[in-house]
């Protein structure tokens, strides 16, 4: 098809046939390169000088000669004189596309076809010149903010269902370029909406992005446009509508805001009829709906989505494109929480839609703030109805009026802490966050310059409220005194211009400011050399200029001369040390921090592991001792009790005065291993003191008192712990990032904590390091990892290398029993007589269909649960457990007397007989003692061999290398406890004095009544495969073998 360009035809605006106009407009846009599949032309500088068929174009790109004239009085017709000036200024020509042969050669068409347009049926790639032309065209159209009014019926999605103005066109920039090619000035129409749309356009204008072919971004669409979008790479394209996130998105969607992304609501319902899906769609994952409907409506893969749901969503999108949007707008506002929106203001807008005064009145701008409507929202500027304004004033206290979407943003602290302005999606102002109260603040509100942003990233920032609240001027170690008086010679250090130096008899001139030397040997000239290079030039074999190069006047080595010069300058300009606050003032400051209200963190301290290092293991020289009152378990070295010999009546330091409650001043965790400080009435956890660099212990053996509490920076006392979410005590920091948390909270939460032991210059240095949950995954069973020059020590490595205390051995040659068929259950009528019921004898030889534990209760058949029966035994007196015991022997004696009230035996779901709980047992409660005959290790080995020959199961528990408890023939019911890889009990070896130890089983978790009790046997994992004992616990983390 060839179209001559010499004749220009004026096209009249036909108001009757609107559909034909739309089709012709789209066709013209495609011909001019506005569409994705149109033809493109090469400029003259790429094809050479051809003097025929010069067609001028605006901004250096070709336009169609079929000029379009709008009948709207607001659009002026372009004069021919302006076109002639553009012809003179522009010397680019439009050429037909080059034709590529199959061999890759390029053929240039003859010059007689310069005034013709040949439609290319192939889809070739663009050249770089074409991309630059299209970018210039698109950027020019975007910067002009053109909005041409037309008579076409366009569908616009606004905040209310009944408001669908037809006089304002919301179209993409590519469609506008096809209509305003011949216009140099177009009127600017402010779009209706809030500040989100205006700031969005300004954001696009300030930061233009190079656009690729067929790639659309958030700046190409506006609120109400129908699009195709997908939420992920593996998700299908789904019809959606672009919404205004500030007014039409739910609060959860607004909180998960993603920069440079468009907020869309997908068509169709998810789950129920009242649920909608939302997403933030980035560039390249969003396309216009109408242009791509034929291509994307027949997607081959829907990635697990129901084709019926996709078809219903597509039908709803097509109805919305035709103007049926009432139900859609209702769903949008219902999901956004705008149920009480009054549409009277929008009806008034619709009546006055043609007035530009209304648009200037509604759209808020910086120049019109003093003329703000009294019913306009302070955050977005939207004018509220009288009824809505009265309601929002009643809900939100204060003088500022906020709409419902802006009021939602004030809850998650999306508001400036000084000017109280609402955070906007594309706010151009810079924000900083206070490290104390976590409130965002405009940098301009606190007079923070952009030059100091890098410094704020490395230091802590506090808002004016926190600075006034915590009185930071008392902290002398954090803030340098800028007003301190210097000495008389407070001028900067002035180095001498040059110094004569000597090396191996050769003189030279040293320039301290340049750190270079000019040799005076006579052959080098004025060339400046480095000290090491000049040293080699002089023939010195020392290879160390610091000692070989000397100053000629004083005969001092150059390095020593430089050090003396720096020391002299330091003494001359030494500042007068600032006056340090007194101990009384620092104590008052610390006590003021601790008087702030907080919620104490109540935790359950058990004897399973050390309360300081979290290790489970103990050794003969470093045993785990348990406080007789608070039941805190600590290592002797961790708590500083190496000289303690009587473990039966030992109490911790805090329990020596039980009438006074002790609490840690560095964290909100109650209880634990506490130690006194050098400040009276203040106590700290040993773990908290370890991870504060300013705190140390005066005595290494006793680990008390803790010194340096008053030297902790005050900024550490205003940090929010990410674990307990409280401001109390002093927080420590992750070694990889700026995450703050209490040391004890991190230890209880399973954070990775390490102790590094280094040796520098013959001196041992200890460094404590911790990691947040992002840089190291937390583990509830983690322990304090010790790194030394000889290696790394952790609980896992010791488990592999240390031979554990053996417990019970199970006979390995068990016979496999075939599973029997499921027995038929007979329904029982609870109101019938016992003699009328069917009696079915149970066969004990058959295996149960389901491996579950059955506790054995003596007393015959029972039709009621044990808890209900126990409530009827009012005559039975159950002795209450005393709150405290004078010694561990007394506690052990009470445990032996009452063990049958807590446990019983029964058929185990793991193996043979097992141990069960008669009642609920709390975490950390002592269950019973593992009793048996104590023999030497040699005797235990002989008995084990004899038991194997006789085919008996042996029950051996090793207390130490010399003593083993044999409960095979002599013992109590505790020997029936089975092994489990996920146990609910653990064993603790406790000393009762006179070098005698006992084994006590303690509940690891809360155990319910009738639940089987288990614990980990901790067999040696390094045994060969032929001695492996299979595990039958069937727990989720089963190790398959007990050793």
Swiss-Prot record:
It is found in: Nucleus. This is Histone-lysine N-methyltransferase ATX5. Zn(2+) binds at residues 981, 1031, 1033, 1038. A zinc finger (C2HC pre-PHD-type) spans 661-695. One of its GO terms (cellular component) is plasmodesma. It is an enzyme of class 2 (transferase). It comes from Arabidopsis thaliana (Mouse-ear cress). GO terms for molecular function: histone methyltransferase activity; zinc ion binding.
């Amino acid at each position: 098809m060839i179209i001559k360009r010499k004749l220009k035809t004026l096209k009249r605006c036909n108001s009757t046939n609107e559909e034909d106009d739309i089709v012709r407009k789209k066709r013209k846009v495609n011909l001019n390169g506005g569409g994705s599949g149109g033809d493109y032309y090469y400029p003259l500088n790429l094809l050479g000088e051809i003097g025929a068929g010069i067609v001028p174009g605006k901004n250096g790109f070709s336009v169609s000669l079929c000029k379009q004239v709008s009948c709207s009085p607001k659009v002026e017709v372009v004069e021919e004189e302006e076109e002639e000036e553009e012809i003179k200024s522009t010397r680019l020509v439009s050429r037909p596309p080059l034709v590529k042969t199959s061999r890759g050669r390029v053929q240039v068409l003859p010059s007689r076809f310069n005034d013709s347009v040949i439609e290319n049926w192939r889809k070739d790639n663009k050249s770089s010149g074409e991309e630059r032309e299209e970018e210039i065209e698109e950027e020019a159209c975007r910067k002009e903010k053109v909005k041409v009014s037309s008579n076409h019926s366009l569908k616009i999605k606004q905040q209310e269902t009944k408001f669908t103005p037809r006089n304002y066109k919301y179209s993409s920039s590519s469609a506008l370029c096809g209509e305003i090619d011949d216009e140099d000035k177009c009127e600017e129409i402010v779009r209706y909406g809030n500040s989100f749309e205006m700031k969005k356009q300004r954001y696009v204008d300030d930061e233009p992005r190079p656009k690729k072919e067929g790639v659309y971004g958030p700046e190409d669409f506006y609120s109400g446009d129908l699009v195709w979008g997908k939420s992920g790479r593996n998700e299908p394209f789904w019809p959606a509508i672009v919404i205004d996130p500030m007014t039409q998105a739910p609060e959860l969607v607004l909180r998960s805001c993603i920069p440079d992304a468009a907020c869309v609501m997908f068509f169709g319902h998810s789950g129920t009829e009242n649920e909608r899906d939302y997403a933030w769609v980035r560039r390249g994952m969003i396309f216009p709906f109408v242009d791509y409907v034929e291509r994307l409506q027949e997607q081959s893969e829907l990635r697990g989505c129901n084709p019926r749901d996709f078809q219903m969503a597509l039908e709803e999108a097509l109805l919305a494109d035709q103007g049926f949007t009432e139900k859609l707008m209702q769903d949008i506002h219902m999901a956004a929480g705008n149920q009480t929106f009054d549409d009277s203001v929008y009806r008034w807008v619709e009546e006055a839609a043609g007035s530009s005064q209304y648009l200037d009145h509604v759209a808020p701008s910086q120049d019109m703030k003093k003329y703000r409507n009294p019913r306009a929202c302070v955050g977005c500027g939207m004018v509220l109805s009288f009824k809505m304004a009265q309601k929002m004033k009643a809900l939100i206290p204060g003088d500022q009026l906020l709409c419902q979407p802006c009021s939602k943003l004030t809850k998650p602290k999306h508001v400036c802490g000084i000017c109280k302005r609402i955070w906007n999606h594309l706010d151009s102002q810079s924000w900083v966050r206070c490290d104390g109260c976590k409130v965002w603040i405009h940098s301009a509100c606190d007079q923070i310059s952009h030059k100091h942003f890098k410094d704020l990233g490395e230091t802590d920032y506090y808002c004016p409220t926190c600075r006034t609240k915590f009185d930071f001027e008392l902290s002398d170690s954090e803030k340098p005194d800028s007003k301190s008086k210097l000495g008389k010679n407070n001028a900067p250090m002035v180095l001498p211009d040059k110094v004569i130096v000597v090396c191996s008899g050769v003189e030279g001139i040293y320039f301290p400011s340049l750190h270079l030397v000019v040799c005076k040997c006579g052959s080098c000239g004025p060339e400046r050399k480095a000290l090491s290079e000049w040293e080699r030039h002089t023939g010195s074999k020392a290879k160390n200029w610091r000692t070989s190069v000397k100053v000629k006047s004083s005969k001092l080595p150059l390095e020593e001369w430089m050090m003396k010069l720096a020391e002299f300058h330091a003494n001359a300009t030494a500042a007068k040390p600032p006056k340090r606050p007194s101990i009384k003032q620092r104590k008052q400051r610390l006590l003021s921090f601790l008087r702030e209200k907080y919620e104490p963190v109540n935790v359950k301290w058990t004897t399973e592991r050390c309360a300081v290092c979290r290790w489970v293991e103990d050794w003969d020289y470093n045993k785990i001792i348990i406080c007789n009152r608070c039941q805190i378990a600590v290592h002797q070295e961790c708590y500083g009790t190496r000289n303690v010999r009587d473990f039966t009546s030992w109490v911790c330091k805090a329990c020596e005065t039980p009438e006074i409650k002790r609490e840690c001043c560095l964290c909100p965790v109650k209880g634990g291993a506490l130690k006194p400080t050098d400040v009276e009435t203040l106590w700290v956890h040993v773990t908290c003191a370890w991870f504060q660099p300013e705190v140390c212990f005066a005595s290494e053996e006793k680990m008390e008192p803790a010194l340096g509490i008053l030297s902790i920076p005050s900024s550490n006392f205003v940090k929010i712990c990410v674990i307990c979410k409280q401001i109390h005590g002093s927080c420590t920091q992750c070694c990889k990032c700026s995450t703050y948390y209490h040391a004890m909270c991190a230890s209880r939460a399973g954070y990775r904590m390490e102790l590094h032991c280094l040796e520098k210059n013959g001196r041992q240095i200890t460094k404590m390091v911790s990691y947040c949950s992002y840089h190291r995954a937390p583990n509830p069973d983690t322990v304090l990892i010790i790194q030394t020059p000889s290696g790394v020590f952790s609980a896992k490595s010791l488990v592999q290398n240390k031979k554990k205390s053996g417990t019970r051995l199970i006979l390995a040659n068990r016979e496999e029993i075939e599973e029997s068929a499921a027995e038929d259950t007979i329904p029982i009528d609870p109101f019938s007589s016992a003699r009328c019921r069917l009696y079915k004898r149970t066969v004990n030889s058959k295996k149960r269909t389901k491996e579950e534990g059955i506790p054995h209760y003596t007393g015959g058949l029972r039709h009621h649960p044990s808890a209900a029966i126990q409530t009827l035994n009012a005559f039975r007196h159950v002795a209450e457990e005393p709150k405290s015991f004078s010694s561990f022997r007394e506690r052990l004696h009470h445990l032996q007397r009452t063990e049958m009230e807590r446990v019983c035996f029964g058929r185990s779901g793991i193996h043979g007989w097992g141990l069960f709980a008669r009642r609920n047992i709390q975490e950390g409660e002592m269950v019973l003692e593992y009793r048996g005959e104590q023999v030497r290790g040699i005797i235990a080995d002989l008995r084990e061999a004899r038991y194997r020959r006789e085919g008996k199961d042996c029950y051996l528990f090793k207390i130490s290398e010399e003593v083993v408890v044999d409960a095979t023939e002599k013992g109590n019911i505790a020997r029936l406890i089975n092994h489990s890889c996920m146990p609910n009990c653990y064993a603790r070896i406790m000393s009762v004095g006179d070098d005698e130890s006992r084994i006590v089983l303690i509940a690891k978790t809360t155990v319910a009544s009738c639940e089987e009790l288990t614990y980990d046997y901790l067999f040696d994992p390094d045994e060969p495969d032929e001695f492996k004992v299979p595990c039958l616990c069937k727990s989720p983390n089963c190790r398959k073998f007990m050793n």
